[in-house]
Amino acid sequence: MAAAFDPSGRFPDLFTSVGTSSFSAFLSKAAPELLPGRRPLPPGMATGLTPHATTIVAIATAGGVVLAGDRRATMGNLIAQRDVEKVHPADAYSLVGMAGAAGIGIELTRLFQVELEHYEKTEGAMLSLDGKANRLAAMVRGNLGAAMQGLAVVPLFAGFDLAATDPAKAGRIFSFDVTGGPYEETGYDAVGSGSVFAKSALKKRFRLGLSVDDAVRLAVEALYDAADDDTATGGPDLTRRIYPVVMSATAEGTHRLTEAETAAIAESVVAGRMENPGG
């Protein structure tokens, strides 16, 4: 239950007392019902009743990391949305993408962004990249009850590590399971229903020391391959001009490719596959 406010208009002690730098920990005391996974759910499975986001890929580069996601959300055998955005900046130097229950994933992403901003404002410094991954892991763990009823959210987190001694290894990738376990991945990773096909494509084409531009094209190709075999993953939609969301994190910060830039890459990939469908 949310903290009761004083009729005089003063904030409750909870809002003014010295506490944790974690916004989600504060929210768990002030209004726990607002946290994902804390709401009571009826018995049964809800897998086919809500839109689900699908495939996200991450690739480490010589100067950072690239994160990309397709735009399709499905509900059972239906396409629920064709232009959903699953990849977002977590803060100035990190990115997060969500696969799974779309509504919970969007809520979890926003909460994670606030969590990192709240920490930076209260502590006067940014969390380390490992610290960010651990905070996200705790949030995913908090959704375990809903995950057991078919409303799982599986994030993919990537960022530029400002504390890295070797700039060539500053791009780091973390995957998670539904219980909140964080796992650092080497080189590349993918999550979602098309991840098996995306990772197969990445496995064949990935090499150490990729430039950001090469990694961006590789990410789009991996999503194309995933869409080719997985009905829940959307490929480049040339008719509606809907293309993957592609972002990078480097020493200069996070950057999202413009619609025109992504369109040019996607159309080039599609043209190449018309000549060689297998890539």
From Swiss-Prot:
GO CC terms: cytoplasm; proteasome core complex, beta-subunit complex
Propeptide feature: residues: 1-53
Active site positions: T54 (nucleophile)
One of the GO biological process terms: modification-dependent protein catabolic process
Keywords: Autocatalytic cleavage, Cytoplasm, Hydrolase, Protease, Proteasome, Threonine protease, Zymogen
Keyword Transit peptide belongs to the record: no
Regulation of this protein's activity per its record: The formation of the proteasomal ATPase ARC-20S proteasome complex, likely via the docking of the C-termini of ARC into the intersubunit pockets in the alpha-rings, may trigger opening of the gate for substrate entry. Interconversion between the open-gate and close-gate conformations leads to a dynamic regulation of the 20S proteasome proteolysis activity.
Entry annotated with the keyword Cytoplasm: yes
CDD domains cross-referenced by the UniProt entry: proteasome_protease_HslV (cd01906)
UniProt-annotated location(s): Cytoplasm
Endpoints of the signal sequence: none
Catalytic activity: Cleavage of peptide bonds with very broad specificity
Enzyme class, spelled out: hydrolase
Enzyme Commission number(s) from the entry: 3.4.25.1
Pathway given in the UniProt record: Protein degradation; proteasomal Pup-dependent pathway
Subunit structure, as described in the record: The 20S proteasome core is composed of 14 alpha and 14 beta subunits that assemble into four stacked heptameric rings, resulting in a barrel-shaped structure. The two inner rings, each composed of seven catalytic beta subunits, are sandwiched by two outer rings, each composed of seven alpha subunits. The catalytic chamber with the active sites is on the inside of the barrel. Has a gated structure, the ends of the cylinder being occluded by the N-termini of the alpha-subunits. Is capped by the proteasome-associated ATPase, ARC.
Function text: Component of the proteasome core, a large protease complex with broad specificity involved in protein degradation.
Family, as annotated: Belongs to the peptidase T1B family.
HAMAP family per UniProt: Proteasome_B_B
NCBIfam families: 20S_bact_beta
Protein's name in the database: Proteasome subunit beta 2
Gene source species: Salinispora tropica (strain ATCC BAA-916 / DSM 44818 / JCM 13857 / NBRC 105044 / CNB-440)
Encoding gene per record: prcB2
